[in-house]
A protein has these predicted regions:
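Extracellular and organelle-lumenal recognition/adhesion modules and their flexible linkers in secreted
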Residues: 1-211
Length: 211
């Protein structure tokens, strides 16, 4: 597909994912960006490519995200004492090594779970698996957006937070830093097969990224 330039408004891109940047035109999103071989079991992937050098400010954030409908998340029972644990699994491929991040948050932007993952080898697909304890607080059910999964491509200090725990802060919807504090060429981050899975029923996936 064609390359889509991220703007400072939500722009739909590949396979239900959307892009956003607090500063426009700092990265592009494209199916099969860079034309690398997809991971085993996939024919395509979502690729994000840095477009220009940029120093990320304290309140800046850049991300690709997917909204998951409430009808697909209601049986997680999040927001109750019976909240179920899920595992977020995906394949990641980067021109850089290091720690990357993202976040899961609710439709009201007041419950967030920042997470990190590590890519130790550049330019190779890495399998990522992140357990996420169900949130016993907040509002999660509904027929519109149930939750949002967001992969950070860069985030400043005021919109970042400590990974691995639920927080009641809208500011953390940007997640962790992603591409560190400066976007510069050439930096490419690719994803395939992003899917939260309920641990107690591993066959159920809340979303599937076919990109």
């Amino acid at each position: 597909g064609a390359s889509i330039t991220a703007s400072n408004t939500v722009t739909f891109t590949v396979d239900r994912f959307n892009s956003y940047g607090s500063a426009a035109a700092k990265y592009t999103v494209q199916q099969n960006a860079g034309s690398v071989t997809p991971p085993v079991g996939f024919t395509n992937y979502l690729g994000c490519t840095s477009s220009s050098a940029y120093s990320v400010g304290a309140s800046d954030f850049f991300a690709v995200s997917q909204n998951i409908e409430g009808v697909n998340t209601a049986d997680l029972s999040w927001g109750t004492a019976s909240a179920k644990t899920v595992t977020l699994s995906f394949q990641a491929y980067s021109s850089l090594t290091g720690t990357f991040g993202g976040v899961i948050y609710n439709a009201l932007f007041n419950r967030s779970f920042p997470f990190t993952y590590t890519i130790s080898s550049a330019n190779t697909w890495t399998s990522i698996s992140i357990p996420i304890a169900g949130d016993t607080s907040g509002t999660w059910a509904g027929y519109a957006v149930g939750l949002t999964l967001s992969f950070s491509l860069g985030a400043g200090a005021s919109v970042s937070g400590t990974a691995g725990a639920w927080v009641g802060a809208a500011a953390l919807r940007a997640g962790l830093r992603g591409w560190s504090n400066a976007c510069s060429l050439p930096r490419i981050l690719r994803f395939a097969g992003a899917a939260p899975t309920i641990l107690s029923r591993a066959s159920k996936r809340l979303l599937t990224c076919l990109c």
